[in-house]
UniProtKB/Swiss-Prot annotation:
Disulfide cross-links: 21-38, 33-52, 36-47, 61-76, 71-90, 74-85, 109-126, 121-139, 124-134
Site (Reactive bond): 87-88
Protein function: Inhibits trypsin activity and prophenoloxidase (PPO) activation, an enzyme essential for both clotting and insect innate immune responses. It does not inhibit activity of chymotrypsin and protease K, and has no effect on phenoloxidase (PO) activity.
Keyword Secreted: yes
Name assigned to this protein: U-reduvitoxin-Pr21
Organism of origin: Platymeris rhadamanthus
GO cellular component: extracellular region
Length: 139
């Protein structure tokens, strides 16, 4: 019971501490690396945006050089032995797949006319050049 009360008190204290601060006070940012200033309203305001040690990637590179790894931007350290990188989630680009096939028209048709393929599986439209654009569907 005492432990539960202590934990409840600690959580309330942490929540209150996180929401309010002394105006003008310098506070360590949640990342443990950057610093923030407390606003006149007692809230955490502007913070520094330094690259933090936990964001370092060990590598040999040209000191001060900026480069990309996937979608993240990195800058090489002064020593040229590590780089500080942003930590964005990079989604791999999928190759573009065509949803239609351009093929010789199966029949004489008027440009803009829609029809079903002979196998009755694909929807097609006649184009001005005499070819057809048909959906790519496996039957």
């Amino acid at each position: 019971m005492k432990t539960a009360l202590f934990l409840l008190f600690a959580l309330v204290f942490i929540a209150v501490e996180a929401r309010f601060c002394t105006p003008g006070q310098r506070i360590r940012a949640p990342d443990g690396c950057n610093w923030c200033r407390c606003t006149k309203g007692g809230r955490i305001g502007g913070c520094t945006k330094m690259f933090c040690r936990k964001n370092l990637v060990k590598m040999d590179c040209k000191p001060g050089k900026k480069f990309k790894i996937d979608c993240n931007t990195c800058i090489c350290s002064k020593e040229g032995k590590a780089a500080a990188c942003t930590q964005k989630l990079c989604l791999k680009k999928r190759p573009k797949r065509s949803l239609i096939n351009i093929e010789k028209s199966e029949r004489n048709c008027k440009p803009g006319q829609n029809y079903m393929s002979k196998d009755r599986c694909k929807k097609c439209v006649c184009m001005k050049d005499g070819n057809s654009a048909c959906t790519k569907v496996k039957c």
